[in-house]
Amino acid sequence: MSVDVGSVPTRKAVSFPLYRTFSRFVRDPLRELERISAEAGGELIRLDLGASRPYLATHPDHVQQVLRRESQNFVRDGMFWRPLRGLFGASIMSEFDEWELSKRILQPVFSTKHVRALTESMADAINAAVDTLEAPAHAGEAIEILPEMGRIVHETVIKVLFGNKIRQAEADRLVPGMEKLATSIAYRFLLPFVPRSIPLPGDRAFAAALEMMDETLYELVDRYRDAPGEGFDIFTALCQARMTEGSGLDDQWVRDNLLSMWATSIETTTVALTWIWPILDRHPEVAGRLRKEIDEVVGGERVRPEHLHRLPYVKQVIQELLRLYPVGWIFPRIAQNPTSVGGVPIKAGDTVLVSPYLTHRLESVWEDPLRFDPERFSPERARTHHRYAYYPFGGGPHMCIGRHVFNFEAELILTSILSRFRPEVRHAEGAIPKIGATIRPRNELKMTLVPLRSAA
């Protein structure tokens, strides 16, 4: 299907009256959106929910216009941001001056240069976290994938987030709290037009988890105020900025940004690494090639940062993983001024949604899009992709600043586990996606790790 990507407002969006199939949409919104996206074939879509009629842009040219070319017109605002604004406040997850200030303060912590300086300590943390998998592996015990990936990610990123300024008991409270926030916000995220006065499933659990998270984070801020310290971690950068940037920054601002970075640094990586194991289980040829590359480069050693540049297939596997299961599955924007997208007039105040998950599965953009094929990201083929055919970290000024940490961490964790074990996933065929703040497997997933070498 040819798609008009011009800017002359002469067309109408493809309309889908979701209010007619609302119960089906609520039961499985991801499947409904996939169906709609496939039928539209890249045309701009109007989702008619009755109370709300947002547009949905999936064609790479339309996405590029919204996220990059007209990023100053399409802003983070409107009802689709209400659940996140209530959670993250005036942080890097916001817009305008609040976002610019937070980004300016946090950007140095996530620079490529600084991330490289952290690689040795992160590799040590990953190897130590993977060490604890040896006991259940040699005992033949199954592990729950998502909690174990969360534990490994948490133990890796905690130094980047807090340096040495957090106690183990405090860190242990934050992990389940973030897990509960991520799962309980799902209905508010999907149904943002429902007033807060009308209770939805998850509201009570969300409030309890948020209260616990806030209590812990404010304790950390209070302690830093009483005994300031040095460091190049996120927490220190925020606390020092609060003291030097003026009276406009308070404890609430520090808390908002801490919670934002906690969610983006841990939740997204955990979920992505949860998906990789059922995918590899269903694609033994990919798993075999991965193991061969890792064995040739790493052998029986502990994984080090210098190994990664010699593991190109590991990088391709992570890239293809993010094509099928991007860390951010949808990005809402609202138009400040009239414009047009794909020839469709957009009024000021209209909401336009862009979805990496849906763009990454368009047949007009990707050949056989549901097939897991890391060769799509070989050097020869990767350069042929449209810039916005693949945008798992968003795009334009709001592209995720933590993407370098994610890539390094994900590649190291995958390599470390596969250098020691052969994972066997139980019921990998049951790994069905469910959307909320991120795209998680609907059902609990377990796997057994078969040791590649005998216990020492």
Enumerate the predicted regions with their spans:
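Cytochrome P450 catalytic-domain helical core, especially the substrate-recognition surface
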Residues: 2-35, 39, 51-53, 61-64, ...
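Conserved cytochrome P450 K-helix E-x-x-R motif and the immediately C-terminal K′/meander segment
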Residues: 21-41, 215, 301-342
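Conserved cytochrome P450 catalytic core segment spanning the I/J/K helices
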Residues: 21, 111, 209-273, 287, ...
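Cytochrome P450 catalytic-core helices
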Residues: 268-293, 404-419
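Cytochrome P450 proximal C-terminal region
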Residues: 3, 37, 126, 130, ...
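Conserved cytochrome P450 K-helix/beta-meander segment immediately N-terminal to the heme-binding cysteine loop
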Residues: 354-381
